[in-house]
Curated annotation (Swiss-Prot):
GO cellular component term of the entry, any: ribonucleoprotein complex
Transmembrane residue ranges: none
Protein species of origin: Microcystis aeruginosa (strain NIES-843 / IAM M-2473)
UniProt feature coiled coil, ranges: none
Protein name in UniProt: Large ribosomal subunit protein bL28
InterPro entries: Ribosomal_bL28, Ribosomal_bL28/bL31-like_sf, Ribosomal_bL28_bact-type, Ribosomal_bL28_sf
Amino acid sequence: MSRVCTMTGKKANNAYAVSHSHRRTKKLQEANLQWKRVWWSEGNRWVKLRISTKAIKTIEKKGLAVFAREVGLNLNLY
């Protein structure tokens, strides 16, 4: 399974690791993804999602149903 947030679509960023002597090697900066069980009140059940920590904060602020509607996510599939 790829490391992509189901709500925001966040994924890894290509970057350089720069040493003290300024040698550059490629590295991946992965998104901080968590498996999170969130209560979906409209569906009256738990939904298990792989989401970023920023998406967790947004769900706490707006609510799961509103945020899913904004990003166009069908919660019946989860």
